[in-house]
Amino acid sequence: MTTSHILGFPRVGAKRELKFAQERYWRKELAEQDLLDLAKALREKNWKHQAAANADFVAVGDFTFYDHILDLQVATGAIPARFGFDSQNLTLDQYFQLARGNKDQFAIEMTKWFDTNYHYLVPEFQKSTAFKANPAHYVNQIREAKALGLNFKPVIVGPLTFLWLGKEKGEAFNRFDLLNQLVPVYVEILNALVAEGAEWIQIDEPALALDLPAEWVEAYKSVYTELSKVNAKLLLATYFGSVAEHAELLKALPVAGLHLDLVRAPEQLAAFEDYSKVLSAGVIEGRNIWRANLNKVLDVLEPLKAKLGERLWIAPSCSLLHTPFDLEVEVQLKEKNTALYSWLSFTLQKVEELNVLKQALNNGRASVQAALDASQVAADARATSKEIHRPEVAERLANLPKGADQRKSPFAERIVKQNAWLNLPLLPTTNIGSFPQTTEIRHARASFKKGELSLADYEAAMKKEIEYVVRRQEELDLDVLVHGEAERNDMVEYFGELLDGFAFTKFGWVQSYGSRCVKPPVIYGDVTRPEPMTVRWSQYAQSLTNRVMKGMLTGPVTILQWSFVRNDIPRSTVCKQIGVALSDEVLDLEAAGIKVIQIDEPAIREGLPLKRADWDAYLQWAGEAFRLSSMGVQDDTQIHTHMCYSEFNDILPAIAALDADVITIETSRSDMELLTAFADFKYPNDIGPGVYDIHSPRVPTATEVEHLLRKALNVIPKERLWVNPDCGLKTRGWTETIDQLKVMVDVTKKLRAELA
């Protein structure tokens, strides 16, 4: 019989119960025990959903209060020494301080989990790091699953991926040298799981889909030789890309099974068809929301079943952390667009799709014929829908003039024209875009969407908020102002609602980091902009002040990366469609007198393929799509872009090729680490490295901000340096926002006087 299993499940709950409970706990409105009880109830629900879908094991250990890599830092005793906490006796408050910072320490750095929109907390390894096992996180969840009478499979990220994802801190050394100390701690943790009755243990090694150095790849042999001495069967899970280049190594490892992502890399199956142990086929897309064509999947699985017999397992391609919880609650979407609804599949539907595949493999297709027929009808309808394909969009792309994505003049000429009218001081200050989204703003938006607030009253509320934001910025003496984005629920969703080819869910939330969830738009058809989206808000904000007002758009690559994207045409084509649609908005802003326009691209690095060999092709089309979004603007219009969570030292030429007049970047959490590359690569345009971390409520000291600004001045000419926070301020409160910005402006004025 074929075994089915799940690699991981969403943590936040069907209605974001965990998020709201966490935030109440942080505000001291919820007792710790109440938070613990809610989390336990969520885990039980998750496991029961998996069991109801006939999964042979439920995944345990994947649930986390903030991040699974932070949990692993605690479990291995590798929490940052600078906090002074005891990992063996860590309180829940201390756990959250690691993630969010406290008055004495900034938060652990956060970055993208491979090429997804989930963020993990980056382990800080020191030469003196002393690992110590604390398996309580996993053991406690196993005990809960056992109490419910469930078959369970613990899930833990493997030692090589864990080390790879970290960074060296302090005295220079290679974190790879810590491996021999880390492995015995893993053995101790695994033994604790075995003592609780674990028969199979899933060890995730997604780093195998990267370009790992030879010594790291070679280390898999010795590491898994040690881990395999544990009295349990190990399932080595890979995902997010192909591991075919390591096929011989993986086939020889002393593990009991191997999981392959056959959605991202279906071609890799050929390299493993002679695998002699359990082969877990990841055939249901774990990162997107499209319904599978189950007949096509069975066409792949049935020959595999004939070869492998009971050694064939089936699963989603990766953890379902990246998909929304349940399609069935999307009643409005079903009423509005029945066809689109029929093409979608969320977490609960995916586990059911897996169950249909399992039944078909074990009992024949006829046993699930109705489900297979429904899957086929949906696939056929999607392939031929006129709602998806709009000939005029393809025509416009095909007929773009040569050089449409290039500015009229080089930066050196443009900046002279821009400076002539901008008349800004040295080290100009600005904000990235958003200001705090207060309860009042959210209430007004929700009331308007429900029809409880008229359009006139809603717009009056937004204008009042915009005026408040403008006045606060004037009081702080900022140089280039923003309107604060009060009218925007989300930097991608807002634009998606106003572009054709997009659809929206009501409950399609996925975790971004900690308690932060996002609700990605669904790009299902060709993209156009039917009417202006932001012009009247920016125009109104500009009417309130004599200072320069910056227009704010989200760029094509970020809209693509932070959406659930159609999978029937290349992503590059979708991205260029968005870029061309945005160019209409940019020209309308310019015509309305908004001549500083920011096109945010925080996700540009996240889109990089995991294998370096594929980078150039991506960077070429991503850069073209970005430049298309401002095609046709005049030289004296200043185009800004913003990037965050990014380590892009290795793609600086591509960033420069975007040819934005000003780039602002997130750098404070990594102590301006990004700027080391500027010593070698003379970035040609203006740049604003973030001088404080907006992900934490902590107000930076003047000394800290000055330290970062001076580091920036060492590598960026003062004439080309801007001063700004790391990112937008949407998630912050007003009190800390004012205090943080005041420190930033005061330090800037001090340095201006010094440099004058």
UniProtKB/Swiss-Prot annotation:
Write down how the cofactor binds this protein: Binds 1 zinc ion per subunit.
Residues holding L-homocysteine: I432, G433, S434, E485, D600
Q: Which residues form a coiled coil?
A: none
| Enzyme Commission number(s) | 2.1.1.14
* Record keywords, A-Z: Amino-acid biosynthesis, Metal-binding, Methionine biosynthesis, Methyltransferase, Repeat, Transferase, Zinc
Instruction: Summarize where L-methionine binds, as residue positions.
Output: I432, G433, S434, E485, D600
CDD domains for the chain: CIMS_C_terminal_like (cd03311), CIMS_N_terminal_like (cd03312)
User: Do you know which InterPro entries this protein is assigned to?
Assistant: Cbl-indep_Met_Synth_N, Cobalamin-indep_Met_synthase, Met_Synth_C/arc, UROD/MetE-like_sf
The positions annotated for binding Zn(2+) are H642, C644, E666, C727
The Gene Ontology biological process terms listed for this entry are: methionine biosynthetic process; methylation
The pathway where this protein functions is: Amino-acid biosynthesis; L-methionine biosynthesis via de novo pathway; L-methionine from L-homocysteine (MetE route): step 1/1
What SUPFAM superfamilies does the record point to? Answer: UROD/MetE-like
- Which residues are 5-methyltetrahydropteroyltri-L-glutamate-binding? R16, E17, L18, K19, K112, R516, C517, W562, E606
The active site is formed by H695 (proton donor)
> Which reactions are catalysed by this chain?
5-methyltetrahydropteroyltri-L-glutamate + L-homocysteine = tetrahydropteroyltri-L-glutamate + L-methionine
Sequence similarity: Belongs to the vitamin-B12 independent methionine synthase family.
Q: What does this protein do?
A: Catalyzes the transfer of a methyl group from 5-methyltetrahydrofolate to homocysteine resulting in methionine formation.
NCBIfam families the UniProt entry points to: met_syn_B12ind (TIGR01371), PRK05222.1 (NF003556)
Please state what the protein is called: 5-methyltetrahydropteroyltriglutamate--homocysteine methyltransferase
- Organism name: Haemophilus influenzae (strain ATCC 51907 / DSM 11121 / KW20 / Rd)
